[in-house]
Amino acid sequence: MAIKKFSSLLLPLLMVLALVVLPIISGRTQEHPCQDYRLGCKSRDVCNAKCLSLGYVKGGDCVTFAFPICCCKINFGFQDDSPISSPIFTD
């Protein structure tokens, strides 16, 4: 009897857990969208210059996960000129 009651509560509990945990996990991966990275980040200026020289228009930044890395920011230039993301509407 107790096993049936436990198993009937287990599925809804797992579903609620999945609904709570999945957005947290997916949100954490988008905090620092790196396209390219180099191990060891000594300064932001050096990292930014390195990423700009590699062709990343938005440059780069030092990010620490388990150790500091130089994270080159993803180029989403086409989204900057999108009329949906622009707060100014012109006719």
From Swiss-Prot:
Family affiliation: Belongs to the DEFL family.
Lineage: Eukaryota, Viridiplantae, Streptophyta, Embryophyta, Tracheophyta
GO cellular component: extracellular region
Protein's UniProt name: Defensin-like protein 82
Cysteines paired by S-S bonds: 34-72, 41-62, 47-70, 51-71
Subcellular location(s) of the protein: Secreted
Keyword Iron in annotation: no
Annotated GO biological process: defense response to fungus; killing of cells of another organism
Secreted in keyword set: yes
Keywords carried by this UniProt record: Antimicrobial, Disulfide bond, Fungicide, Plant defense, Secreted, Signal
Signal peptide residue numbers: 1-27
Superkingdom, taxonomy of origin: Eukaryota
Main location, first listed in the record: secreted
